[in-house]
């Protein structure tokens, strides 16, 4: 971690992780019983609000931090080979020491499965008993944005290490994915694929609100 990357109090962080395991109890039909995973996660945090065409006065008032992030994850299992890559852009700021805001301006993630064993397809995916389960084992593009609000009545007491009685907190989260892409697909007359899904460059994209 570097806390002054460009001499402006920026914070750069990078993490690596890995795992290896021999899976026992697998049924016949799989090439091996090895599980390997590794990943890397990096982010850079700027102590100010970065956005084009925004006045300096607005940036001073909001006092937000800006974070850009990149992630990559690789999973090789007997059942499948799966990779995930993502890039994100977000803002965070605190209001009156009690309220925390976070805006995920955009997060783009790509889930890719170049290999799924035939045994795994037959035993789980092709049975069609769980649509969500099938969804998690398909190539997918996820473009989402979101907002979170966190109110803590203790506020500054946490900073000052004092004890507050009858404290409470309120949390609110909103996340939306694919709805803008869906509207553009409808407007431009893009046809759905064989699975009745809209796609970008042949890759289906996720659509939800939560």
Language-model segments: residues:
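Membrane-proximal, glycine/serine-rich, low-complexity loop/turn segments characteristic
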Residues: 2-11, 33-35
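Short small-residue beta-strand/loop micro-motif enriched in glycine and branched aliphatics
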Residues: 7, 23-25
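Transmembrane beta-strand segments of outer-membrane beta-barrel domains in Gram-negative
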Residues: 13, 19, 26-210
């Amino acid at each position: 971690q570097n806390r002054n990357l460009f001499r402006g109090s920026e914070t750069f962080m990078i993490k690596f992780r890995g795992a290896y395991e021999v899976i026992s109890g697998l049924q016949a039909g799989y090439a091996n019983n090895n599980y390997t995973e590794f990943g890397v996660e990096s982010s850079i945090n700027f102590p100010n609000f970065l956005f084009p065409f925004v006045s300096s006065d607005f940036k001073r008032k909001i006092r937000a931090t800006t974070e850009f992030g990149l992630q990559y994850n690789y999973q090789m299992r007997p059942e499948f080979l799966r990779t995930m890559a993502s890039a994100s852009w977000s803002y965070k700021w605190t209001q009156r020491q009690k309220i925390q805001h976070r805006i995920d301006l955009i997060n783009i993630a790509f889930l890719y499965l170049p290999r799924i064993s035939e045994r795994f397809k037959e035993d789980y995916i092709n049975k069609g008993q769980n649509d969500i389960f099938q969804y998690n084992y398909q190539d997918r593009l996820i473009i989402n944005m979101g907002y979170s609000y966190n109110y803590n009545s203790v506020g500054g007491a946490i900073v000052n290490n004092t004890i507050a009685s009858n404290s409470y907190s309120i949390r609110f989260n909103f996340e939306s994915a694919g709805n803008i892409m869906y509207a553009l697909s409808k407007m431009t007359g893009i046809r759905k694929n064989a699975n009745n899904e809209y796609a970008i460059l042949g890759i289906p994209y996720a659509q939800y609100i939560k």
